[in-house]
Amino acid sequence: MSSGGLLLLLGLLTLWEVLTPVSSKDRPKFCELPADIGPCEDFTGAFHYSPREHECIEFIYGGCKGNANNFNTLEECESACAA
């Protein structure tokens, strides 16, 4: 392979690495949990990571219990699960 072809291949691989989202094997297991409103009724907006949608989605949280796939802000959710 010529040096130009090798350089092109290296550039394409680098671009692919940058644009590829975090794979599920690198994502914490709690990010795969379903949204859980919890048993309380102090309803507030929260965010959870949706493995099906591959993004963080807002949902209504009851204010207690639930599970670890529950974040106060979109930024917290994306930092933990959707990087």
Curated annotation (Swiss-Prot):
This is Kunitz-type serine protease inhibitor scutellin-3. It comes from Oxyuranus scutellatus scutellatus. Disulfide bonds join 31-81, 40-64, 56-77. Expressed by the venom gland. SMART domains: KU (SM00131). InterPro entries: Kunitz_BPTI (IPR002223), Kunitz_BPTI_sf (IPR036880), Prtase_inh_Kunz-CS (IPR020901), TFPI/VKTCI-like (IPR050098). One of its GO terms (molecular function) is serine-type endopeptidase inhibitor activity. Residues 1-24 form the signal peptide. Serine protease inhibitor. Belongs to the venom Kunitz-type family. Keywords: Disulfide bond, Protease inhibitor, Secreted, Serine protease inhibitor, Signal. Residues 31-81 form the BPTI/Kunitz inhibitor domain. It is found in: Secreted. Gene3D superfamilies: Pancreatic trypsin inhibitor Kunitz domain. GO terms for cellular component: extracellular region.
